[in-house]
Amino acid sequence: MTDSPVLALAKDLISRQSVTPEDAGCQDLMIERLKALGFEIEVMVFEDTTNFWARRGNEAPLFAFAGHTDVVPAGKLEQWDTPPFEPTIIDGYLHGRGAADMKGSLAAMVVAVERFIAEHPDHKGSIGFLITSDEEGPFINGTVRVVEALMERGENIDMCIVGEPSSTEIVGDVVKNGRRGSITGDLTVKGTQGHVAYPHLANNPVHASLLAIHELATTEWDKGNDYFPPTSFQIPNVSAGTGASNVIPGEFNVQFNLRFSTELNNDTIVQRVTETLDKHDLNYDLHWTFNGDPFLTDTGALLDAVVAAVAEVNNTKPALLTTGGTSDGRFIARMGGQVVELGPVNATIHKVNECVKVDDLEKLTDMYENTLKHLLAK
Protein backbone atom coordinates (compact mmCIF):
# COMPACT_ATOMS: atom_id res chain seq x y z
CA MET A 1 0.00 0.00 0.00
CA THR A 2 1.38 3.39 -1.00
CA ASP A 3 1.88 5.90 1.80
CA SER A 4 -0.24 9.04 1.72
CA PRO A 5 1.61 12.29 0.90
CA VAL A 6 1.73 13.43 4.52
CA LEU A 7 2.88 10.06 5.84
CA ALA A 8 5.56 9.75 3.16
CA LEU A 9 6.96 13.20 3.93
CA ALA A 10 6.83 12.62 7.69
CA LYS A 11 8.81 9.41 7.25
CA ASP A 12 11.38 11.15 5.08
CA LEU A 13 11.86 13.87 7.69
CA ILE A 14 12.08 11.45 10.63
CA SER A 15 14.75 9.39 8.86
CA ARG A 16 17.13 12.36 9.05
CA GLN A 17 19.07 12.63 12.32
CA SER A 18 18.53 16.33 12.91
CA VAL A 19 19.51 16.59 16.57
CA THR A 20 19.82 20.25 17.60
CA PRO A 21 21.26 22.30 15.92
CA GLU A 22 21.64 19.94 12.97
CA ASP A 23 19.06 20.09 10.19
CA ALA A 24 20.38 17.04 8.31
CA GLY A 25 18.71 18.04 5.06
CA CYS A 26 15.16 18.32 6.41
CA GLN A 27 14.79 21.90 5.29
CA ASP A 28 16.02 21.07 1.79
CA LEU A 29 13.15 18.59 1.51
CA MET A 30 10.64 21.25 2.49
CA ILE A 31 12.24 23.93 0.33
CA GLU A 32 12.08 21.71 -2.76
CA ARG A 33 8.35 21.20 -2.25
CA LEU A 34 7.70 24.88 -1.58
CA LYS A 35 9.71 26.10 -4.57
CA ALA A 36 7.48 23.97 -6.79
CA LEU A 37 4.51 25.95 -5.43
CA GLY A 38 6.03 29.31 -6.28
CA PHE A 39 7.47 30.23 -2.89
CA GLU A 40 10.43 32.59 -2.73
CA ILE A 41 13.02 31.03 -0.43
CA GLU A 42 15.49 32.81 1.82
CA VAL A 43 17.92 30.59 3.71
CA MET A 44 19.25 32.26 6.87
CA VAL A 45 22.24 30.63 8.55
CA PHE A 46 23.29 32.06 11.91
CA GLU A 47 26.30 30.42 13.55
CA ASP A 48 25.50 26.69 13.77
CA THR A 49 21.79 27.07 13.01
CA THR A 50 20.00 26.67 9.70
CA ASN A 51 16.75 28.56 9.14
CA PHE A 52 14.64 29.45 6.17
CA TRP A 53 11.91 31.94 5.40
CA ALA A 54 9.60 31.15 2.50
CA ARG A 55 6.88 33.39 1.13
CA ARG A 56 4.29 33.12 -1.61
CA GLY A 57 2.55 36.37 -2.47
CA ASN A 58 3.09 40.00 -1.61
CA GLU A 59 -0.33 41.02 -0.36
CA ALA A 60 -1.75 41.28 3.14
CA PRO A 61 -2.58 39.49 5.28
CA LEU A 62 0.58 37.43 5.72
CA PHE A 63 -0.25 34.04 7.21
CA ALA A 64 2.66 31.79 8.20
CA PHE A 65 3.33 28.31 9.46
CA ALA A 66 6.23 28.09 11.92
CA GLY A 67 8.14 25.09 13.18
CA HIS A 68 11.45 23.37 13.76
CA THR A 69 13.31 20.56 12.06
CA ASP A 70 15.58 19.82 15.02
CA VAL A 71 14.81 17.12 17.56
CA VAL A 72 16.05 16.21 21.02
CA PRO A 73 18.60 13.38 21.34
CA ALA A 74 17.24 9.85 21.20
CA GLY A 75 18.89 8.85 24.48
CA LYS A 76 19.66 5.18 25.12
CA LEU A 77 18.98 3.33 21.89
CA GLU A 78 18.43 0.01 23.66
CA GLN A 79 15.33 1.48 25.33
CA TRP A 80 13.62 2.04 21.98
CA ASP A 81 11.45 -0.69 20.49
CA THR A 82 12.54 0.43 17.01
CA PRO A 83 15.54 2.52 15.86
CA PRO A 84 14.59 6.17 16.53
CA PHE A 85 15.59 7.40 13.08
CA GLU A 86 14.03 4.53 11.15
CA PRO A 87 10.35 5.51 10.89
CA THR A 88 8.22 2.49 11.65
CA ILE A 89 4.46 1.98 11.78
CA ILE A 90 3.18 -0.18 14.63
CA ASP A 91 -0.55 -0.64 15.24
CA GLY A 92 -1.45 2.53 13.36
CA TYR A 93 1.22 4.71 15.00
CA LEU A 94 4.26 6.19 13.28
CA HIS A 95 7.26 5.74 15.57
CA GLY A 96 10.48 7.75 15.46
CA ARG A 97 12.21 10.69 17.08
CA GLY A 98 10.38 13.84 16.02
CA ALA A 99 7.19 12.05 14.96
CA ALA A 100 5.13 14.25 17.29
CA ASP A 101 7.62 17.04 17.96
CA MET A 102 7.43 18.17 15.30
CA LYS A 103 8.16 16.53 11.97
CA GLY A 104 4.61 15.26 11.71
CA SER A 105 3.40 18.85 11.89
CA LEU A 106 5.91 19.98 9.26
CA ALA A 107 4.72 17.31 6.86
CA ALA A 108 1.09 18.27 7.49
CA MET A 109 1.86 21.95 6.86
CA VAL A 110 3.53 21.30 3.51
CA VAL A 111 0.85 18.93 2.24
CA ALA A 112 -1.94 21.23 3.43
CA VAL A 113 -0.42 24.13 1.50
CA GLU A 114 0.06 21.97 -1.59
CA ARG A 115 -3.60 20.99 -1.53
CA PHE A 116 -4.80 24.52 -0.81
CA ILE A 117 -2.78 26.09 -3.63
CA ALA A 118 -3.95 23.42 -6.07
CA GLU A 119 -7.53 24.51 -5.35
CA HIS A 120 -6.82 28.21 -4.83
CA PRO A 121 -3.81 29.25 -6.94
CA ASP A 122 -4.91 32.90 -6.79
CA HIS A 123 -5.59 32.97 -3.07
CA LYS A 124 -5.87 36.14 -1.04
CA GLY A 125 -2.94 37.48 0.96
CA SER A 126 0.38 35.69 1.35
CA ILE A 127 1.58 32.39 2.83
CA GLY A 128 4.86 32.03 4.67
CA PHE A 129 6.99 29.35 6.34
CA LEU A 130 9.41 30.16 9.18
CA ILE A 131 11.47 27.05 9.91
CA THR A 132 14.49 26.64 12.22
CA SER A 133 16.88 23.95 13.47
CA ASP A 134 17.33 25.65 16.86
CA GLU A 135 14.15 25.26 18.89
CA GLU A 136 15.07 22.37 21.16
CA GLY A 137 18.44 23.92 22.05
CA PRO A 138 19.57 27.37 23.20
CA PHE A 139 17.10 29.14 20.85
CA ILE A 140 19.46 32.04 20.17
CA ASN A 141 20.18 31.62 16.45
CA GLY A 142 16.83 30.32 15.31
CA THR A 143 13.37 31.84 15.11
CA VAL A 144 14.33 34.88 17.15
CA ARG A 145 17.03 35.84 14.62
CA VAL A 146 14.71 35.34 11.66
CA VAL A 147 12.03 37.44 13.35
CA GLU A 148 14.56 40.20 13.96
CA ALA A 149 15.63 40.14 10.31
CA LEU A 150 12.04 40.29 9.08
CA MET A 151 11.08 43.09 11.45
CA GLU A 152 14.09 45.17 10.42
CA ARG A 153 12.73 45.30 6.88
CA GLY A 154 9.12 45.77 7.95
CA GLU A 155 7.96 42.28 6.98
CA ASN A 156 5.66 41.33 9.83
CA ILE A 157 3.62 38.15 10.13
CA ASP A 158 -0.06 38.94 10.69
CA MET A 159 -1.20 35.44 11.63
CA CYS A 160 0.83 32.36 12.53
CA ILE A 161 0.24 28.72 13.42
CA VAL A 162 3.12 27.13 15.31
CA GLY A 163 3.03 23.36 14.87
CA GLU A 164 3.99 22.45 18.43
CA PRO A 165 2.24 19.33 19.78
CA SER A 166 -0.60 21.09 21.57
CA SER A 167 -3.05 18.20 21.79
CA THR A 168 -3.56 15.95 24.81
CA GLU A 169 -5.98 13.09 24.07
CA ILE A 170 -6.96 13.50 20.41
CA VAL A 171 -5.46 15.74 17.76
CA GLY A 172 -7.00 19.19 17.93
CA ASP A 173 -8.57 18.85 21.37
CA VAL A 174 -6.36 21.70 22.60
CA VAL A 175 -5.21 24.84 20.82
CA LYS A 176 -2.67 26.96 22.65
CA ASN A 177 -3.69 30.58 22.17
CA GLY A 178 -0.95 31.93 24.41
CA ARG A 179 1.97 31.03 26.62
CA ARG A 180 3.35 32.27 29.89
CA GLY A 181 6.52 34.31 30.02
CA SER A 182 9.69 32.88 31.56
CA ILE A 183 12.52 34.55 33.43
CA THR A 184 15.39 32.88 35.30
CA GLY A 185 17.49 34.37 38.08
CA ASP A 186 20.92 33.08 39.10
CA LEU A 187 21.57 34.39 42.59
CA THR A 188 24.90 34.21 44.44
CA VAL A 189 24.77 35.31 48.08
CA LYS A 190 28.20 36.06 49.50
CA GLY A 191 29.30 35.28 53.03
CA THR A 192 32.55 34.48 54.82
CA GLN A 193 33.90 30.94 54.82
CA GLY A 194 34.97 29.48 58.12
CA HIS A 195 35.03 26.53 60.53
CA VAL A 196 31.65 25.35 61.75
CA ALA A 197 33.02 25.31 65.31
CA TYR A 198 33.75 29.04 65.09
CA PRO A 199 30.64 30.58 63.55
CA HIS A 200 31.45 33.96 65.10
CA LEU A 201 34.45 34.13 62.75
CA ALA A 202 32.37 33.40 59.64
CA ASN A 203 29.18 34.55 57.96
CA ASN A 204 26.97 31.75 56.68
CA PRO A 205 25.27 32.92 53.45
CA VAL A 206 22.78 30.04 53.58
CA HIS A 207 21.44 31.15 56.96
CA ALA A 208 21.42 34.78 55.85
CA SER A 209 19.40 33.95 52.74
CA LEU A 210 16.70 31.68 54.10
CA LEU A 211 14.17 34.33 55.07
CA ALA A 212 14.54 36.14 51.75
CA ILE A 213 14.24 32.92 49.76
CA HIS A 214 11.20 31.87 51.77
CA GLU A 215 9.59 35.24 51.13
CA LEU A 216 10.17 34.97 47.39
CA ALA A 217 8.84 31.42 47.31
CA THR A 218 5.64 32.32 49.17
CA THR A 219 4.93 35.65 47.49
CA GLU A 220 1.65 36.00 45.62
CA TRP A 221 3.02 37.59 42.46
CA ASP A 222 -0.42 38.00 40.92
CA LYS A 223 -3.79 36.32 40.85
CA GLY A 224 -3.63 35.36 37.19
CA ASN A 225 -6.52 36.28 34.92
CA ASP A 226 -9.12 34.72 32.65
CA TYR A 227 -6.42 33.24 30.43
CA PHE A 228 -3.45 32.54 32.70
CA PRO A 229 -2.94 30.90 36.10
CA PRO A 230 -1.14 32.87 38.82
CA THR A 231 2.57 33.39 38.31
CA SER A 232 4.71 30.50 39.58
CA PHE A 233 8.06 30.90 41.39
CA GLN A 234 10.17 27.73 41.52
CA ILE A 235 13.72 26.92 42.66
CA PRO A 236 15.28 24.19 40.48
CA ASN A 237 18.88 24.36 41.70
CA VAL A 238 20.81 25.30 44.87
CA SER A 239 24.44 24.77 45.82
CA ALA A 240 26.82 25.73 48.62
CA GLY A 241 29.82 24.44 50.50
CA THR A 242 32.90 22.39 49.77
CA GLY A 243 31.39 19.01 50.55
CA ALA A 244 33.05 18.96 53.94
CA SER A 245 30.82 18.86 57.02
CA ASN A 246 33.03 21.21 59.04
CA VAL A 247 33.24 24.17 56.64
CA ILE A 248 30.79 27.07 56.58
CA PRO A 249 30.34 27.98 52.90
CA GLY A 250 31.50 31.29 51.51
CA GLU A 251 28.79 31.44 48.86
CA PHE A 252 25.24 30.22 48.39
CA ASN A 253 23.96 29.79 44.84
CA VAL A 254 20.24 29.72 44.12
CA GLN A 255 18.67 29.44 40.69
CA PHE A 256 15.00 30.33 40.42
CA ASN A 257 12.50 30.62 37.60
CA LEU A 258 9.22 32.46 37.26
CA ARG A 259 6.54 31.50 34.74
CA PHE A 260 4.43 34.62 34.58
CA SER A 261 1.16 35.81 33.16
CA THR A 262 0.29 38.95 31.24
CA GLU A 263 -0.29 40.59 34.64
CA LEU A 264 3.51 40.97 35.01
CA ASN A 265 6.52 41.86 32.92
CA ASN A 266 10.28 41.39 33.22
CA ASP A 267 10.93 44.82 34.71
CA THR A 268 8.32 44.40 37.44
CA ILE A 269 9.71 41.00 38.42
CA VAL A 270 13.29 42.28 38.58
CA GLN A 271 12.20 45.21 40.73
CA ARG A 272 10.22 43.10 43.19
CA VAL A 273 12.94 40.45 43.57
CA THR A 274 15.61 43.11 44.08
CA GLU A 275 13.52 44.90 46.69
CA THR A 276 13.05 41.65 48.62
CA LEU A 277 16.75 40.78 48.60
CA ASP A 278 17.77 44.30 49.59
CA LYS A 279 15.24 44.33 52.43
CA HIS A 280 17.10 41.38 53.97
CA ASP A 281 20.44 43.18 53.70
CA LEU A 282 22.14 40.51 51.62
CA ASN A 283 25.47 40.81 49.84
CA TYR A 284 24.67 39.27 46.48
CA ASP A 285 25.14 39.12 42.73
CA LEU A 286 22.12 38.43 40.55
CA HIS A 287 22.17 37.53 36.86
CA TRP A 288 18.95 37.44 34.87
CA THR A 289 18.07 35.42 31.78
CA PHE A 290 14.99 36.67 29.98
CA ASN A 291 13.52 33.65 28.22
CA GLY A 292 10.47 35.29 26.73
CA ASP A 293 7.43 37.46 27.36
CA PRO A 294 3.94 36.04 27.70
CA PHE A 295 1.70 36.28 24.67
CA LEU A 296 -2.02 35.89 24.13
CA THR A 297 -4.33 35.71 21.14
CA ASP A 298 -7.75 36.02 22.74
CA THR A 299 -9.71 37.10 19.66
CA GLY A 300 -9.24 37.58 15.94
CA ALA A 301 -9.61 36.02 12.52
CA LEU A 302 -6.88 33.42 13.08
CA LEU A 303 -8.39 32.05 16.27
CA ASP A 304 -11.84 31.94 14.69
CA ALA A 305 -10.47 30.12 11.64
CA VAL A 306 -8.51 27.55 13.65
CA VAL A 307 -11.41 26.79 15.98
CA ALA A 308 -13.72 26.34 12.99
CA ALA A 309 -11.15 24.20 11.14
CA VAL A 310 -10.73 21.86 14.09
CA ALA A 311 -14.49 21.61 14.64
CA GLU A 312 -15.00 20.66 10.98
CA VAL A 313 -12.70 17.66 11.45
CA ASN A 314 -13.50 16.64 15.05
CA ASN A 315 -17.13 17.76 15.27
CA THR A 316 -16.24 19.56 18.49
CA LYS A 317 -14.46 22.78 19.31
CA PRO A 318 -10.99 22.71 20.86
CA ALA A 319 -10.17 23.95 24.33
CA LEU A 320 -8.14 27.16 24.33
CA LEU A 321 -5.29 26.94 26.85
CA THR A 322 -2.07 28.76 27.75
CA THR A 323 -0.51 25.98 29.83
CA GLY A 324 2.89 24.39 29.34
CA GLY A 325 6.35 25.72 28.67
CA THR A 326 7.63 28.32 26.26
CA SER A 327 7.68 27.99 22.48
CA ASP A 328 8.97 29.96 19.52
CA GLY A 329 5.55 31.57 19.38
CA ARG A 330 6.86 34.08 21.93
CA PHE A 331 9.31 35.46 19.37
CA ILE A 332 6.79 35.62 16.54
CA ALA A 333 4.30 37.40 18.81
CA ARG A 334 6.74 40.32 19.01
CA MET A 335 5.61 41.24 15.51
CA GLY A 336 2.23 42.15 16.93
CA GLY A 337 0.26 39.53 15.03
CA GLN A 338 -1.99 36.69 16.10
CA VAL A 339 -0.23 33.46 17.14
CA VAL A 340 -1.66 30.07 18.07
CA GLU A 341 -0.25 26.56 18.39
CA LEU A 342 -1.88 23.50 16.88
CA GLY A 343 -0.20 20.13 16.55
CA PRO A 344 -0.28 16.42 17.43
CA VAL A 345 -0.89 14.70 20.75
CA ASN A 346 2.03 15.41 23.08
CA ALA A 347 1.93 12.23 25.22
CA THR A 348 5.22 10.81 23.88
CA ILE A 349 7.28 13.89 23.05
CA HIS A 350 10.91 13.79 24.24
CA LYS A 351 10.38 10.17 25.33
CA VAL A 352 11.65 6.86 24.02
CA ASN A 353 9.26 5.36 21.46
CA GLU A 354 7.97 8.79 20.46
CA CYS A 355 5.06 8.29 18.09
CA VAL A 356 2.07 9.88 16.40
CA LYS A 357 -1.14 8.27 15.21
CA VAL A 358 -1.04 7.99 11.42
CA ASP A 359 -4.68 9.01 11.18
CA ASP A 360 -3.89 12.10 13.25
CA LEU A 361 -1.45 13.27 10.59
CA GLU A 362 -4.26 13.15 8.04
CA LYS A 363 -6.60 15.01 10.38
CA LEU A 364 -3.98 17.63 11.20
CA THR A 365 -3.41 18.21 7.48
CA ASP A 366 -7.15 18.74 7.05
CA MET A 367 -7.18 21.20 9.96
CA TYR A 368 -4.32 23.20 8.49
CA GLU A 369 -5.91 23.21 5.03
CA ASN A 370 -9.30 24.23 6.41
CA THR A 371 -7.66 27.11 8.26
CA LEU A 372 -6.12 28.34 5.01
CA LYS A 373 -9.50 28.12 3.30
CA HIS A 374 -11.18 30.19 6.01
CA LEU A 375 -8.48 32.86 5.89
CA LEU A 376 -7.24 33.09 2.30
CA ALA A 377 -9.67 31.42 -0.12
CA LYS A 378 -11.33 33.84 -2.52
Swiss-Prot record:
UniProt keyword terms in alphabetical order: Amino-acid biosynthesis, Cobalt, Diaminopimelate biosynthesis, Hydrolase, Lysine biosynthesis, Metal-binding, Zinc
Needs which cofactor?
Answer: Zn(2+); Co(2+)
| Record GO terms (molecular function) | acetylornithine deacetylase activity; cobalt ion binding; succinyl-diaminopimelate desuccinylase activity; zinc ion binding
Pathway the protein takes part in: Amino-acid biosynthesis; L-lysine biosynthesis via DAP pathway; LL-2,6-diaminopimelate from (S)-tetrahydrodipicolinate (succinylase route): step 3/3
Q: What is its EC number?
A: 3.5.1.18
Which Gene3D superfamilies does the UniProt entry name for this protein? Zn peptidases (3.40.630.10)
GO BP terms, alphabetized: diaminopimelate biosynthetic process; L-arginine biosynthetic process; lysine biosynthetic process via diaminopimelate
Which residues are in coiled coils?
none
Q: Which reaction does it catalyse?
A: N-succinyl-(2S,6S)-2,6-diaminopimelate + H2O = (2S,6S)-2,6-diaminopimelate + succinate
**UniProt binding sites for Zn(2+) 2:** 101, 136, 350
What sort of enzyme, by top EC class, is this? hydrolase
Q: Does the keyword Metal-binding apply?
A: yes
Q: Where do the annotations place Zn(2+) 1 binding?
A: 68, 101, 164
Is Plastid among this UniProt entry's keywords?
no
Q: How is the cofactor bound?
A: Binds 2 Zn(2+) or Co(2+) ions per subunit.
Q: What residues form the catalytic site here?
A: 70, 135 (proton acceptor)
* Task performed by this protein: Catalyzes the hydrolysis of N-succinyl-L,L-diaminopimelic acid (SDAP), forming succinate and LL-2,6-diaminopimelate (DAP), an intermediate involved in the bacterial biosynthesis of lysine and meso-diaminopimelic acid, an essential component of bacterial cell walls.
The record's family statement is: Belongs to the peptidase M20A family. DapE subfamily.
Q: What is this protein called?
A: Succinyl-diaminopimelate desuccinylase
Q: Which organism is it from?
A: Vibrio parahaemolyticus serotype O3:K6 (strain RIMD 2210633)
Whichever gene encodes this chain, its name is: dapE
